[in-house]
From Swiss-Prot:
A GO biological-process term: animal organ development
Keyword Transmembrane helix: no
Name by which UniProt lists this protein: Somatotropin
GO molecular function: growth factor activity; growth hormone receptor binding; hormone activity; metal ion binding
Statement: the UniProt record of this protein carries the keyword Metal-binding: yes
Principal cellular location given in the protein's record: secreted
Subcellular location: Secreted
SUPFAM superfamilies: 4-helical cytokines
Alphabetical keyword list: Disulfide bond, Hormone, Metal-binding, Phosphoprotein, Secreted, Signal, Zinc
Pfam families: Hormone_1
Signal sequence coordinates: 1-27
A Gene Ontology cellular-component term: extracellular space
Family (UniProt): Belongs to the somatotropin/prolactin family.
């Protein structure tokens, strides 16, 4: 029974990931708000998992195990996203409005659109390469989904504006340089953290709007 349920959930996820976003508010047939949220959460989860897998593979390939802890501590304040007043976890996110969380999610996603365009060149001969070379398209797709939700929920509240003025550097393809390796390692760490934030915000919004048994996270 559990296997059948898992299979059905997986098939639903695959189906939702293949659905297009409505291009206009008046598009027909209109997608229910619950489906828009479900679609966005699935895409964010997929991207977060991809970012985590990519980070781990890079770490295994290039960062000596004995150096990982000290490097990770040094990277604690590296991410530009730490400079914006976005919630740092689920509890803080629950104190913000849906529109605030959508705007922060959008800022986080947009800050990576430039840097990830070189990501696939960092992972030659990589098991992750088959998906990492499509990260840009996946980010654009999630950006579009968040914008669709914002159109549906537009409430006239003040916009957060261009808070994240500084985007991330691009990934360095010179993997023979120790500095480049450390830079890429730091970027991948931030990429993983930022996508986790975006996923958390979207899940908080979905759960408080549509009470369901899968809200615990």
């Amino acid at each position: 029974m559990a296997t059948g349920s898992h299979t059905a959930t997986l098939l639903l996820a695959v189906a939702l990931l293949g659905l297009p976003w409505p291009q206009e508010a008046g598009a027909f047939p209109a997608m229910p708000l619950s489906s828009l949220f479900a679609n966005a959460v699935l895409r964010a989860q997929h991207l977060h998992q991809l970012a985590a897998d990519t980070y781990k593979e890079f770490e295994r390939a290039y960062i000596p195990e004995g150096q990982r802890y000290s490097i990770q501590n040094a990277q604690a304040a590296f991410c530009f996203s730490e400079t914006i007043p976005a919630p740092t976890g689920k509890d803080e996110a629950q104190q913000r409005s849906d529109m605030e969380l959508l705007r922060f999610s959008l800022l986080l996603i947009q800050s990576w659109l430039g840097p990830v365009q070189l990501l696939s060149r960092v992972f030659t001969n990589s098991l992750v390469l088959g998906t990492s070379d499509r990260v840009y398209e996946k980010l654009k797709d999630l950006e579009e989904g968040i914008q669709a939700l914002m159109r549906e929920l537009e409430d006239g509240s003040p916009r957060v504006g261009q808070i994240l003025k500084q985007t991330y550097d691009k990934f360095d393809t010179n993997l023979r340089s120790d500095d480049a390796l450390l830079k890429n390692y730091g970027l991948l760490s931030c990429f993983k953290k930022d996508l986790h934030k975006a996923e958390t915000y979207l899940r908080v919004m979905k759960c408080r709007r549509f009470v369901e048994s899968s809200c615990a996270f």
